[in-house]
């Protein structure tokens, strides 16, 4: 089977420009440096805080888990350098946008780069010693004669956030990555993942990944798409990502 993930160079340059923002770069660097519980806590702050006011009143942010709030309090009391660097850059990023719905929408585009970059760099790290494994981002999908650029309209979605293919093992993975899963009007993204899995005869595992807990992701999906079969898509929440 022939599988490849041609990169959308224009889209990649756009993402990399946002990734070069000093605040984004610092936040991603800290997330990549953390594992397990620390990663869970840092990622949860990114997930559940979407405006400057949230960062100014972390104990009052309703959806942040209590154990994360306790961790924040401890890190603040200990004056942990990594935590203060993370918070400084995250606050700088958030406060750089007008605190209106329009500003939060623009900020959301920058926030969305954070989990996508995390997954991409984790995959690059995982397969660094295996040159036969190709890891791409902002990429189209080609499976034998099927090409997402010609077989799907732009409105349906033609790209995945991250694509991985091992030509020797004939196995791969694709990831659609979100900060939180709010795709009420984007069922086509789920269908795209299912099509990839089907056309590859299940040789490409498909993932919907988020910084939100898996149970929250599933609650959202079931609320948005009642009765929809979700069994073809692997759901990864913050717990799964911290062990990626």
What are these model-predicted stretches?
Residues 1-244:
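Intrinsically disordered, low-complexity Ser/Thr/Pro/Gly-rich regulatory segments
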């Amino acid at each position: 089977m022939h599988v490849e993930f041609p990169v959308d160079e224009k889209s990649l340059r756009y993402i990399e420009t946002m990734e070069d923002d000093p605040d984004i770069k610092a936040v991603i660097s800290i997330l990549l440096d953390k594992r397990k519980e620390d990663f869970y806590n840092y990622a949860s702050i990114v997930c559940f805080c979407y405006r400057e006011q949230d960062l100014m009143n972390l104990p009052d942010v309703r959806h942040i888990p209590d154990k994360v709030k306790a961790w924040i309090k401890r890190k603040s009391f200990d004056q942990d350098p990594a935590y203060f660097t993370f918070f400084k850059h995250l606050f700088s990023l958030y406060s750089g946008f007008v605190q209106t719905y329009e500003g939060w929408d623009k900020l959301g585009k920058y926030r969305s780069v954070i989990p996508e970059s995390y997954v991409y760099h984790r995959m690059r790290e995982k397969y660094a010693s295996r040159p036969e494994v190709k890891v791409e981002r902002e990429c189209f999908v080609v499976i034998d004669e099927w090409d997402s650029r010609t077989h799907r309209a732009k409105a349906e979605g033609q790209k995945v956030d991250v694509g991985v293919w091992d030509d020797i093992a004939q196995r791969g993975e694709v990831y659609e990555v979100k900060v939180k899963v709010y795709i009420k009007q984007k069922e086509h993204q789920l269908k795209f993942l299912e099509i990839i899995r089907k056309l590859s005869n299940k040789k490409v595992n498909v993932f919907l990944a988020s910084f939100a807990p898996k149970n929250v992701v599933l609650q959202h999906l079931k609320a948005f798409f009642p009765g929809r079969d979700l069994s073809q898509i692997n759901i990864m929440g913050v717990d799964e990502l911290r062990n990626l």
